[in-house]
Amino acid sequence: MKTGFSVFIAVFVAMCFSWSGFVLGPVRQLGTEGQTNILNSSDIYPNQRPGAATLGLQVYRAYGCAQCHTTQVGQDGVICNVVLTAAGTKSAAVSNLISTLKLTGLTKDEADAVSGQITAAGGKTETHIVATGADISRGWGPRHSVAEDFLWDNPAQLGSVRVGPDLANIGARYNADWEFMHLYNPGSEVKNSIMPPFRFLFKKEKIDGTLSSDALPLQGELAPPAGYEVVPTDDAKNLVAYLLSLRMDVPLYDAPFSTLAPPAAAKKK
């Protein structure tokens, strides 16, 4: 009897520790997460997703998009690049000094030391922070994903398998026209794409006077019969709204990087 009771107590204690570590701990750590400030700005991140994008999250979930895509960018580390912004009145001396210095791929301490040398010579510099890693080099995002990126997602669609590319920052890479065409005929937008077409998210309608503004520009064998057009359904519009809301292109305290220029224009066919 004593042995049975001891085993019960041991199992109960083990379960309590497991529950505390795997359930209570994460809830206490992440359950209080809130909006944060963009680095060096008073702007708040993230903004709540628009209504269509919130509905689109449920479409994304319903059709199992997370089975083939992740929304979490990884990162190995950061490097610092020192950039000369002004040579000052001793430009020749500064130029000669720079020719002897390593300016890229530095640690923070190395970058501070190099900047100090250039400043002492009369020049002015900026230190640019650049995230590194396989996902970064693929262009999937400028930094790693953090908890705040998923603040408004319930449930968060992290995914674990990458049959297709990561989508954490896809809203900064493509526009709505591209997304609709990619859903209808993936191969027309991505060469050798293995993604199945989602044509059931579109409908064929008779043209009423003029072509609808959201009609797909289909050609060749994909074109509808004369007098008809192919337009997205509400599910397609909401899904695309959600995909366009997936952006993590702002620097945060937990994931800094230097914004060198305004985002490039979204790709359009």
Language-model-derived ranges and their functions:
Residues M1-P50, A131, V240-K269:
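Post-cleavage N-terminal segment of exported redox proteins
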Residues F12-W19, T85-T89, N96-I98, T104-G116, ...:
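Electron-transfer interface patches adjacent to heme c in soluble/periplasmic c-type cytochromes
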Residues G34-R61, Q67, V73-I79, D109, ...:
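Electrostatic cytochrome c docking/interface patches
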Residues A53-A66, A223-K237, V250-S258:
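Sequence context surrounding c-type heme c attachment/ligation sites in exported
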Residues R61-C65, T70, T119-G123, A168, ...:
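Sec-exported extracytoplasmic/periplasmic mature domains
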Residues Q67-T71, T125-I129, N192-P197, V250-T259:
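Surface-exposed patches in mature extracellular/periplasmic domains of secreted proteins
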Residues T70-G77, R199-G209, V250-P251:
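Short regulatory "switch" loops immediately downstream of catalytic or recognition motifs
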Residues C80-L84:
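A short beta-strand micro-motif
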